């Protein structure tokens, strides 16, 4: 398989009034095309910082990131970044919100708009396209947020705890919905989550981080069936064994 993303010895430090804080230390991993990778770790260990560095929003103190073999700043790969909250503009309709990346790119082509329209139709939001975010459920807003993230046809999706703002039952349903969209569209994805079950139910590989300064403790290849839904993966007898293994790794770090 071809590497879409490679992080090589990424480190991050920042200065406070008192001293220098080391957040990340020698983080190295790669993500293959079409792969779904989850990153888990203790609270405050720098998971979101890793996504921000990949997205080019935060400059690392050391190390190198390459996208399709080229340095991040020189690459032409499109990256979609979905935050914890849906961040839909309340004054815009669902359709207008999903068109936003096209507007940013000044892409006025009917072909691009039609592609977004097809996503809205395929994933059950077409009849709600003229509604405003407040008129939709939390799950539907998250679906709209993912479609907006994919509107510019990104090569790489970054998901920063996209289900954390939802109640447990809605979270399971939305996780299934978003997973189906990502797999159908064959999107290369990096998910950050504090939820072990969420990571296990979606990822091909799981990267386990230590407490700060964060290092990689382990990278696990998850042998659960990726052709079934996240909810079905949770029913696999191996799921609980994986959960216990990962929980012990994280608990050891506390």
Kindly label every feature range from the protein language model.
Residues 132-136, 140:
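Conserved ABC ATPase signature
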Residues 55:
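Helix-to-loop junction immediately C-terminal to a conserved catalytic motif
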Residues 40-42:
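The feature captures the beta-strand-to-loop junction immediately N-terminal to the Walker
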Residues 95-103, 113:
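Short helical segment in ABC ATPase nucleotide-binding domains corresponding to the A-loop/adjacent helical element
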């Amino acid at each position: 398989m071809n590497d879409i993303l490679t992080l090589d010895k990424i480190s991050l430090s920042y200065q406070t009034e008192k001293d220098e804080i080391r957040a990340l230390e020698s983080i190295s991993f790669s993500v293959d095309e079409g792969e779904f990778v989850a990153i888990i770790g203790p609270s405050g260990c720098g998971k979101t910082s890793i996504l921000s560095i990949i997205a080019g929003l935060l400059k690392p103190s050391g190390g190198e990131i390459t996208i399709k073999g080229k340095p991040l700043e020189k690459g032409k790969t499109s990256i979609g970044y979905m935050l914890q909250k849906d961040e839909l503009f309340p004054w815009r309709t669902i359709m207008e919100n999903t068109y936003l990346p096209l507007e940013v790119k000044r892409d006025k082509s009917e072909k691009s708009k039609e592609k977004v329209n097809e996503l809205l139709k395929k994933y059950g939001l077409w009849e709600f396209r003229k509604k405003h975010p407040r008129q939709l459920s939390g799950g539907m807003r998250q679906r709209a947020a993912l479609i907006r993230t994919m509107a510019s046809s990104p090569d790489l999706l970054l998901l920063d705890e996209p289900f954390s703002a939802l109640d447990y039952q809605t979270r399971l349903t939305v996780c299934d919905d978003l997973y189906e969209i990502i797999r159908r569209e064959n999107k290369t994805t990096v998910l950050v989550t504090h939820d072990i079950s969420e990571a296990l139910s979606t990822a091909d590989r799981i990267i386990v981080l230590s407490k700060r300064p964060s290092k990689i403790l382990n990278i696990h290849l998850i042998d659960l069936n990726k052709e079934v839904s996240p909810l079905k993966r949770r029913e696999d007898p191996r799921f609980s064994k994986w959960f216990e293994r990962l929980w012990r790794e994280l608990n050891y770090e506390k």
